[in-house]
Amino acid sequence: MKRNTKIALVMMALSAMAMGSTSAFAHGGHGMWQQNAAPLTSEQQTAWQKIHNDFYAQSSALQQQLVTKRYEYNALLAANPPDSSKINAVAKEMENLRQSLDELRVKRDIAMAEAGIPRGTGMGYGGCGGGGHMGMGHW
């Protein structure tokens, strides 16, 4: 009976070690935006953090407004009968918000370039780190 307990404990320990080591083979730790990224100096890290914080502060209100307009747009489409003039007006507002967000992104990219921060490869084709078709906007 004692021998069977030891065998069971050894098997459980080996199983736990095997399950814990699988993350080593899964290329963990990269995350989005880390593919082929050059290591940043401490000055670049500080500059990147400031640029990122500034961009977030400027863009978060616009992003929230865009989400609200999407809900409004969908509600107008679901109305019976749909009011095309209201739908077109909300669509135009959404386009203006997207344009404002794009302008902020360009300003952020310019600030990063001026700070000497490499842009990296981004999310890649399909929106998931460089491969496949199952990313953002693909079903």
UniProtKB/Swiss-Prot annotation:
Organism: Escherichia coli O6:H1 (strain CFT073 / ATCC 700928 / UPEC)
GO annotation, cellular component aspect: periplasmic space
Keywords attached to this entry: Periplasm, Signal, Stress response, Zinc
InterPro entries per the UniProt record, alphabetical: Metal_resist
Places the protein is found: Periplasm
Primary localization class, coarse: periplasm
Name of the encoding gene: zraP
UniProt keyword annotation of Zinc present: yes
Source organism superkingdom: Bacteria
Function noted in UniProt: Part of the Zra signaling pathway, an envelope stress response (ESR) system composed of the periplasmic accessory protein ZraP, the histidine kinase ZraS and the transcriptional regulator ZraR. The ZraPSR system contributes to antibiotic resistance and is important for membrane integrity in the presence of membrane-targeting biocides. ZraP acts as a modulator which has both a regulatory and a chaperone function. The zinc-bound form of ZraP modulates the response of the ZraPSR system by inhibiting the expression of the zra genes, probably by interacting with ZraS.
Positions of transmembrane segments: none
Protein's name according to its UniProt entry: Signaling pathway modulator ZraP
Disulfide pairings: none
Pfam families, per database record: Metal_resist (PF13801)
UniProt keyword Zinc, yes or no: yes
Entry's family note: Belongs to the ZraP family.
